[in-house]
Every structure is written in C-alpha cells, then in structure tokens.
C-alpha cells in the first residue's frame, strides 16, 4: 500500500479567511504539516471577501486585540517580508457615540485598549472635524 506518512497532517484548519490563511502560513513556516479546508474554491472568498479590507484592533477581548495588532504588523510589512505588493494602506477606524451611555462605554474601552498597546484616542466633535474636515456633522 505504500508509505502513508504523507497522508497525515499535524494540523487541519477549517476556513481559509483572515484567521485560517495566516495561521496556516505561520504553521507551515515552522515546518508543521498543515491542511486547510474551505467550502470555497480559493482563499478569502467567505466573510473575508465581504469585509472592507480593513484590519482593526479595537476590540474588547485582549486576545483579539493582540491578534489584530500582530496582523497589522504583518500586513504592513508584507511586501518586505514576502515580496508581494498587497496594496497595504494604513488607515483608521472611527466609532461614534450617539448617546451618553455609548460614550461612557467607549471611553472605558479606550483605557483597556491603550493598556494593550493600541494607539487610540478620544476625539470630541471639534477634534474629529480637524481630522476629517469634509464630513457633514
């Protein structure tokens, strides 16, 4: 029957989106035999394709924050590391507080996110208009 050694994998990843594909890449770089299974015919065709292409680390879960910070670091250096121009653009995200309760929640979250290494700030209306002057308040 031959050598079955090649029929086994150390890790099987379900999904080739924004989590599965880079996880497989890093595991393979470490010499870990990895298989990626996805219902779509090519990488990134599920929810990753429907995203706007941004990567944000503004989460409440510390593990997600760390993962996204690492993703930002990786994608910002992708061309230097792998030679492919992925049209990386360093942008930003804005979350608007329409009510006092939302403002309180977001301000509390900012402290947590800063403690995890995020470069994040609270902008009042005037500060925001300086950053994005063409917005219609």
Model-based region annotation:
Residues 3-6, 28, 88:
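Short, flexible hinge/linker loops that cap or flank conserved catalytic cores
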Residues 26, 45, 85-87:
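Short secondary-structure boundary/capping segments within folded domains
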Residues 134-137:
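Short, intrinsically disordered, charge-balanced linker/junction segments flanking boundaries
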Residues 52-131:
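Dinucleotide-binding Rossmann-like beta1-alpha1 core, especially the glycine-rich loop
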Residues 8-9, 31-32, 91, 118:
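Short coil/turn connectors at secondary-structure junctions
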Residues 3-19, 35:
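Beta1/beta-strand and adjacent pyrophosphate-binding region of the FAD-binding site
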